[in-house]
Regions:
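Charge-rich, well-structured scaffold segments of protease-associated domains
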Residues: 1-36, 52-76, 82-231, 235
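Short, low-order "capping/linker" segments at domain edges
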Residues: 40-44
Length: 235
């Protein structure tokens, strides 16, 4: 391929017809407008013809949490995911399991976008349990805000996060690759903040100092107290 010939053609036939100064590109990702009220959505997913639809519903409770550029929120909700849902005996997960909602309950904090999302999911639940699912989550969260979170669980979550950061054991993946991806989580949205989530030790120490102050309970009250659930359908 004659590269010079191709580039000349591109310039003569296309690029030379435009002035770069006349092209205004709005590349900044805008914040999503918040809902005025709780929104309930129903979506279906495919299953095989011989699979029953009963007890194949996923119930999901989802909340937007600030922006990925807030380093304290970024770390704090990773800790809250552990404390509320992921740790053994975590109160929200245990409350849903004890109520017989779903065969399994798990949480996630999706932080690879401008507006991170905190989710609590009940797997293989009954569609009719939608109202109870939300009610149990919110009643449990309200109780935790009132009575306080288990401080040992908070400390364990923070210490675990610090250990994983210091160990930096990413298995088969190169450490540099994972560091680069973590940089992109903030860099994509602010050119001046590529390293805020790598510089996390000070943030974790700050969170450690907040355990007894009601900081985490205030975050639950502010951000967690919309619902999305999916149900199966034959392909």
């Amino acid at each position: 391929m004659d590269i010079e010939e191709r580039l000349t053609w591109l310039d003569e036939e296309y690029l030379s017809h435009y002035d770069a100064n006349e092209v205004e590109v709005h590349s900044q990702i805008q914040l999503q407008k918040p809902f005025d009220a709780v929104v309930s959505e129903r979506r279906t997913y495919p299953i095989t013809e011989d699979e029953p639809e009963e007890k194949h519903t996923y119930l999901s409770y989802n909340k937007v949490v600030g922006t990925v550029l807030d380093r304290e929120l970024y770390q704090a909700f990773s800790i809250l995911d552990y404390v509320l849902v992921s740790a053994p005996g975590a109160p929200v997960r245990q409350a849903l399991i004890d109520a017989g909602i779903g065969e399994d309950v798990y949480g996630s904090f999706e932080d690879g976008m401008l507006q991170p999302m905190f989710s609590i999911v009940a797997k293989n639940a009954d569609e009719s349990d939608q109202t109870r699912f939300v009610q149990i989550i919110e009643e449990t969260l309200q109780k935790l805000v009132k009575e306080g979170l288990n401080q040992d669980s908070l400390l364990a979550g923070i210490n675990s996060a610090e250990f994983r950061f210091r160990e930096a054991d990413y298995g088969q993946f190169p450490k540099g690759l994972l560091y680069g991806l973590q940089c992109m989580e903030s860099w994509l949205f602010d050119d001046t903040k590529p390293f805020i989530h790598l510089e996390c030790l000070d943030t974790l120490q700050f969170l450690r100092e907040q355990i007894k102050t009601g900081y985490f309970e205030d975050l639950i009250q502010k951000y967690l107290l919309c619902l999305l659930y999916t149900s199966p359908s034959p392909r």
